[in-house]
Amino acid sequence: MAKKITGYIKLQVPAGKANPAPPIGPALGQHGVNIMEFCKAFNAKTQADEGTITPVVITVYADRSFTFITKTPPVPVLIKKAAGIASGSAVPNKTKVGKLTKAQVEEIAKTKMPDLNAASLEAAMRTVEGTARSMGVDIV
C-alpha cells in the first residue's frame, strides 16, 4: 500500500546552497521532516547548477519521510542570466534594461518546456517574451 501523504511544501532555494536556516528550516520543521537530510539530498542533486534559484516540491509522508522534485529555474531568473542584468526595470514600459534575441528566447522556452503548460514551443516562446516585456527587456 502507498504511504499516506501529509503535505506538500513548495520552496525556491538556491541550487547547492540549502541550509537549515529560514526559509527551509521552519517550512520543513512544521511537518517534522529531518531538515539536514533534505539539505544534503537537495545539495547533492543540484550541485551542477550551483547558485541558480531552483523551485522544489517536497512531498511529506505520514511516517515523516519525504521525496522531492526539482523543477527548472523561474523564467525571470533565466531572462536575467541571458540578458546579463541584475534585476528587471522598475518602469518596464519606459525604461528598458536589456535585450534578448529570438534565439535566446527559444533557448529559455526549451529549458522551461517541461514545467510550462504550453502546447507548443511557439506558445512557450510567447510566454517567455511576455515575461521579458514585463521586466523591461526588449526582444530583438
Curated annotation (Swiss-Prot):
GO molecular function, one term: structural constituent of ribosome
GO biological process: translation
PTM statement from Swiss-Prot or TrEMBL: One or more lysine residues are methylated.
UniProt-listed Pfam families: Ribosomal_L11, Ribosomal_L11_N
CDD domains, sorted: Ribosomal_L11
GO terms under cellular component: cytosolic large ribosomal subunit
Keyword terms, alphabetized: Methylation, Ribonucleoprotein, Ribosomal protein, RNA-binding, rRNA-binding
Top-level taxonomic group: Bacteria
Function (record text): Forms part of the ribosomal stalk which helps the ribosome interact with GTP-bound translation factors.
Family: Belongs to the universal ribosomal protein uL11 family.
Summary of subunit composition and partner proteins: Part of the ribosomal stalk of the 50S ribosomal subunit. Interacts with L10 and the large rRNA to form the base of the stalk. L10 forms an elongated spine to which L12 dimers bind in a sequential fashion forming a multimeric L10(L12)X complex.
Name recorded for this polypeptide: Large ribosomal subunit protein uL11
Species the sequence originates in: Pelobacter propionicus (strain DSM 2379 / NBRC 103807 / OttBd1)
Source taxonomy: Bacteria, Pseudomonadati, Thermodesulfobacteriota, Desulfuromonadia, Desulfuromonadales
